[in-house]
From Swiss-Prot:
Binds 1 Ca(2+) ion. GO terms for cellular component: extracellular region. Expressed by the venom gland. The active site is at 74, 120. GO terms for molecular function: calcium ion binding; calcium-dependent phospholipase A2 activity; phospholipid binding; signaling receptor binding. GO terms for biological process: arachidonate secretion; fatty acid biosynthetic process; lipid catabolic process; phospholipid metabolic process; positive regulation of fibroblast proliferation. Residues 1-21 form the signal peptide. This is Acidic phospholipase A2 2. It is an enzyme of class 3 (hydrolase). It holds the Pfam family Phospholip_A2_1. CDD domains: PLA2c (cd00125).
Length: 146
């Protein structure tokens, strides 16, 4: 092994990516996170990952409030995007722009990317307009989401 190969191997092993114990975030979720941070800079995007009955993985029952309803609509939007041939919203990346809290899905996205971008954009805008109730974070799904 040449010194150059050893240097590259060492860089990968000690880099933040190589040393990370957490799984990498799918690129689409990373983009959605950034959209949320664009429209709601005052809150951590993580606050929306386990909120109500629909924000986070899955979803069932009646949304607990307007913010949870934003997530329910987002879930349905992804379901519609999945009807586009070969479209998997959770891994589909897209081109967009955030400028002073305004999100724009760029032209040039294919049909799937355009649909997913619009789903994420509308959800992030909805989050910005809905009140956040701390009592609806990390709720008992079995008790409240029937």
């Amino acid at each position: 092994m040449t010194p150059a190969h050893l240097l590259i191997l060492a860089a990968v092993c000690v880099s933040p990516l190589g040393a990370s114990s957490s799984r990498p975030m799918p690129l689409n979720l990373y983009q959605f996170k950034n959209m949320i941070q664009c429209t709601v800079p005052s809150r951590s995007w993580w606050d929306f990952a386990d909120y109500g009955c629909y924000c986070g993985r899955g979803g069932s029952g009646t949304p607990v409030d307007d913010l949870d309803r934003c997530c329910q609509v987002h879930d349905h939007c992804y379901n519609e995007a999945e009807k586009i041939s070969g479209c998997w919203p959770y891994s589909k990346t897209y081109s967009y722009e955030c400028s002073q809290g305004t999100l724009t899905c760029k032209g040039g996205n294919n049909a799937c990317a355009a649909a997913v971008c619009d789903c994420d954009r509308l959800a992030a805008i909805c989050f910005a307009g809905a009140p956040y109730n701390n009592n609806n974070y990390n709720i008992d799904l079995k008790a409240r989401c029937q």
